[in-house]
Each structure stands twice: as C-alpha cells, then as structure tokens.
Amino acid sequence: MKGILFFFFLLPLLSHPQTIDNHFKIDQIGYRPNDKKIAVISDPQTGYNAPDPYTPGATLELRRESDHVVVFSGAPVAWNSGATHAQSGDKAWWFDFSTVTTPDDYYINDPANNKRSY
C-alpha cells in the first residue's frame, strides 16, 4: 500500500506537461481536407516580444487531440533562408502538414522543447 501511495505522489513530479506556446501560428478555424496546411513558427528578434525567443526542434509532430497520437512528423523549414522579416522583426519557419487529410482536431508538438500549439 505504501508503494502505491508513493507512486501517486511521485507521478506529478515525473510527468512534464507540455507548455502551450504562442510561437505557433495556425488557422484557428481549421483547414479543409485537401487544402494546403502550413503552420508558421516565429522567433522574435526585435520588437516588444524579442525577450521571448524560440527555436523549434529539428522535428515537429502533428498529434490528434483526442489521444495525442502522432499522425505526422517532419522538419520545420526556415523561411527566406533564416532571414529576419523586416516588418515583424521575426525569424520564421514553415511546417507543412498538407498530407494529413483526415478531419479531426490536431495540435503541433515540439518534443525537443516540450511545447505545443493551441
């Protein structure tokens, strides 16, 4: 019995909940099944949000919200060879998950940084 109680007290310390992060820009309304689906990931360089940098990991995942199963994974691609966008002051990456055509609720997960989209 003591072992079971110890496990339940230890479990919250072992789990690492993912942080919902606003660096992922996705269509909040959704995508039609055969549409091009691209998320934009931003890394602020200048401006009000510059103190909140973010560089995505080498591989991002698209996960189904209901059971958190990975349905697609791929590498983010640097926008404009990694240049900073003059108007926004951000560097950006594109994450194309257009091959996913099954309607459902999904989120983008960055396992290297333990962050996810809304």
Summary of predicted features, one role per range:
Residues 1-19:
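Bacterial Sec-dependent N-terminal signal peptides
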Residues 20, 24-118:
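Ligand-binding face of N-terminal immunoglobulin V-set domains in extracellular IgSF glycoproteins
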